[in-house]
Amino acid sequence: MAVKIKLQRLGKIRTPHYRVVVADARTKRDGKVIENIGIYEPKQDPSVIKIDSERAQYWLSVGAQPTESVAALLKVTGDWQKFKGIEGAEGTLRVAEEKPSKLDLFNQALSEANNGPTAEAITEKKKKAREEKEAKEAAEKAAAEKAAAAEAEASEEAPAEEAASEEA
């Protein structure tokens, strides 16, 4: 039985995803397979290529013939070079950068927001309560300023009185 390593197509019309499979050469593209040995997603940047190297080496050693596209994938991953004993067995596979975790993104957004929203939801009750609170705080602040001013005046007058009493 002639065995081939080929691509089995998955996905929607313009978003192809492939499985790298081992199947009889006479079966349809999406027909029955012997073993699934990897995946290939060409639309990602960089393309996602995950092939089980051990299984690919086994099937190549027992005589499975890769199609042209699978042979190109095996060269990128370095499996073809391992099989043939050629230098450059590490391949030229590009790996996508790791994305930050959602928890890290959340914590970063939380720190940027200074631990709270900048604007509150406003309803009539909340608006009145906020205005009353602001008025009360303003009155307290004004009273505190008056008390501080009176204290400052008293302290300014007291040394003058002491100086006058010393002169007399």
Curated annotation (Swiss-Prot):
Residues 110-168 are annotated as: Disordered. Residues 153-168 have a biased composition (Acidic residues). InterPro entries: Ribosomal_bS16 (IPR000307), Ribosomal_bS16_dom_sf (IPR023803). The keyword Ribonucleoprotein applies. Coiled coil: none annotated. Pfam families: Ribosomal_S16. Residues 129-144 have a biased composition (Basic and acidic residues). Keywords: Ribonucleoprotein, Ribosomal protein. GO terms for molecular function: structural constituent of ribosome. GO terms for cellular component: cytoplasm; small ribosomal subunit. GO terms for biological process: translation. Belongs to the bacterial ribosomal protein bS16 family. This is Small ribosomal subunit protein bS16. The lineage of its organism: Bacteria, Bacillati, Actinomycetota, Actinomycetes, Mycobacteriales.
